[in-house]
Amino acid sequence: MRPLILVTNDDGLHSPGLLAAAESVSDLGDLLIVAPATQQTSMSRAFVTGDDIGAIERHDLRVAGRTVAAYSVVGSPVVAVTHALLELADRPPDLCLSGINYGENVGGALGVSCTVSAALEAEAHGVPGIAASVQVDVASWRKFDDLDWSAARHFTRALARQVLADGLPSDVAVLNANIPRDATPNTEIRRTVQSRQPYYVHSLPEGTRVPTDPLRLRIAATVDADQLEANSDIRAIVCDGVVSVTPLSWSMTAHTDWQPRAEYLDDGAPRSTR
C-alpha cells in the first residue's frame, strides 16, 4: 500500500504554498489535503471554539495535472489536523507535511507558528511531521504574492522522501525546514538549532490613537547579528542564505543545574499544621 501523506498548512486551502507542498510529494504516496478554511497565521497550537468550528467542506484541487479531493475545516490548523486524523483519514498517515508557509518560522517565532504546531499536532497522534516555510517579506504573509516555488518544492520533497524511508529518531517530533527567498535546488542545506532570538518583533505604529479603537501592531523581522548563535536557524537563512532544517522535540526543558532554594520557600507566612 502506498504511503498516506497528510498535507496541511495555516494559510488556508487556497494558498499557493499548500499546492506547492502537495505537488512536491504527489508521486510519493496518496494525498490527504486538509487545511483551515481561512488564514490562521500565528494561532500556534490553539484549539479554537465557536458554533461553526469543525465544519468540513470538500473541494476539488488540481495537483500535478490531476484532480485531488481536498477539505477545508473551520478552525485553527490543529483543529484541521485533528479532524483529518480522526474522521477523514482512512488509515493512519505515514507523514504530515505542513506548509509551504509564506514566511520563515525561525527563532522565537516557533512559539506562535501554526505551520510548526500543525505538524506537532500530527506527531501527537503518532504521525511524523515536516514543517516547511519559505522566506518572504512580512507584507507578503497574507497577500499570496507570486513566488518561484521550485527550490521549496525540491527541498520539501527531499525531506519527505527521507522521512518516509527512514522515519525520525525517537526524540525528534518534527523537522522544521526554512528555505531562503533566493534559494535554488543547489543551495546548501544545513542542520541547525533554534535561535534564542525572538526574530519577529512588534512595535506600536506612529501617531496617536484612541485606546478603545482597534490597533494593529507593526511587526518586523529583526536580527542581532553580533549575538546570533553560529549554528542557528536564523543565521542559516538570514545571514548565510542556506536552507535550515532544525529537528524539534516536544521537550521545553532547559538543560541547567538550577534548583529551588530553601531560603525562598520559607517566607514567614503561617503554615497549616493539618
In which residue ranges do the predicted regions lie?
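Short acidic, Gly/Ser-rich segments with clustered Asp/Glu that frequently serve as metal-coordination loops
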Residues: 11-19, 209-210
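Glycine/threonine-rich flexible loop motifs
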Residues: 104-113
